[in-house]
Amino acid sequence: MSTRYHQAASDSYLELLKEATKRDLNLSDEDGMTPTLLAAYHGNLEALEIICSRGGDPDRCDIWGNTPLHFAASNGHAHCVSFLVNFGANIFALDNDLQTPLDAAASREQNECVALLDKAATAQNIMNPKKVTRLKEQAQKNARRQIKECERLQEKHQNKMAHTYSKEESGTLSSSKGTFSRSSPSNASAPGTFGSLSKGIKDTFKIKFKKNKDTAEQVGKEGRSGQRNVMEVFREEEEDSFSGDFKEKLQLSAEEDGSVHHESILNRPGLGSIVFRRNRISSPEDISDSKREFGFKLPSELLQRQGASEADEGAADEEGEENGLKDDLPWDDDEVEWEEDVVDATPLEVFLLSQHLEEFLPIFKREQIDLEALLLCSDEDLQSIQMQLGPRKKVLNAINRRKQVLQQPGQLVDTSL
């Protein structure tokens, strides 16, 4: 299974690898990968050195027979290949395709790794040919064992998948059988139910058939006797009852119409004794009626002046209300501008504006540099994007000041409002 040491070997987390034991460093996951294989695969030389120094096996392979040398050579990690060769890893090891690390590097066109492995193989053949022969025999023996183990794992996996598939199929069939079996107890009482149901259906059919038969006989009689008279359609009793009911309904409707009283529109629940202001000027007829009602006469000029003053007061009140509403608003309608389409400034734009360096924004946008990338840039990086000396110094000075402020933010104090 995969452990934290596998992840540490992949990410080159050295502090955690220094705490690992020999068992932890040689533990395989579901693909047969050990921390040694992962470090060689990713080209993490420092992690590979720590793992091998703490007991990691440099000749351990995965389920496909790939050793750390195979991974390092095929991925072009020449520094890892050199370390493994010097550490004593078997350069003649074979994978399940019977390929050596030299063959794997050649298939990937890793020329530097091919040169290192060829030089090491030549040196070992010259120095100790017997050891080379023994290493090749051991590699072939290990390759045969690895191939058998891989075939066994594949067969086991296929059997497991077939068993899972058959189990799912049997589960589906058993569930359908269970559905049928659960419906069988209800079928046990079916004879009585079906008997009563069939009896009811038969009775219904008999009634329907009898009714249809009577209707057919009646129609036949009418057809033989000819067309019926109009007086035969309604009976006398029905006519009397119909006329009596109709007369009663007419009397009730007349009484209801007489009792209906249309109330005023102002007589509504909840309004109480609210006084509604009259917004119109009195007409001459109303004025003349009021003269006759109160029994005194007013000069027509006075009434005209009074009506004009009331109209002026009403217009002034309306204008005052409108002006009051406008004065209560905390903003000016003419100056309000909707900013729905305004895009927020990026952190890079804010940083450059705060340092008065906004003229360099197009250069950084052209190179797709954001604020995080800018903080990682050095003088050589800025020079590589063809920035002049003066702008480079300004940008680097602003970056240094930002880093100093972030490192020493200062103490937070309360301020008086």
UniProtKB/Swiss-Prot annotation:
Name the residue ranges with Polar residues bias.
171-190
Superkingdom as given in the UniProt entry: Eukaryota
Q: Where is this region: Mediates localization to microvilli?
A: 1-252
Chief subcellular location equals: other
Q: Which CDD domains match?
A: CEN_ANKS4B (cd21802), SAM_HARP (cd09587)
Q: What is the tissue localization of expression for this protein?
A: Expressed in kidney and small intestine.
Q: Does the keyword Isomerase apply?
A: no
In the record, which positions carry Phosphoserine?
283
Q: Which residues lie in coiled coils?
A: 130-164
What happens on changing residue 48 to P? Decreased localization to microvilli
Positions of short motif PDZ-binding: 415-417
Q: Which residues form the SAM domain?
A: 351-403
UniProt-listed SMART domains: ANK, SAM
Q: Which Gene3D superfamilies match?
A: Ankyrin repeat-containing domain (1.25.40.20), Transcription Factor, Ets-1 (1.10.150.50)
Q: Where is this region: Disordered?
A: 151-195, 305-330
Query: Which parts of the chain are ANK repeats?
Result: 31-60, 64-93, 97-126
Q: Which portions of the chain have biased composition (kind: Acidic residues)?
A: 310-322
Cross-referenced Pfam families, in alphabetical order? Answer: Ank_2, SAM_1
Q: Summarize the protein's role.
A: As part of the intermicrovillar adhesion complex/IMAC plays a role in epithelial brush border differentiation, controlling microvilli organization and length. Plays a role in assembly of the complex. May play a role in cellular response to endoplasmic reticulum stress.
Q: Note the subunit structure.
A: Part of the IMAC/intermicrovillar adhesion complex/intermicrovillar tip-link complex composed of ANKS4B, MYO7B, USH1C, CDHR2 and CDHR5. Interacts with USH1C; the interaction is direct and is required for ANKS4B localization to the tip of microvilli. Interacts with MYO7B; the interaction is direct. May interact with HSPA5.
Q: What is the designated name of this protein?
A: Ankyrin repeat and SAM domain-containing protein 4B
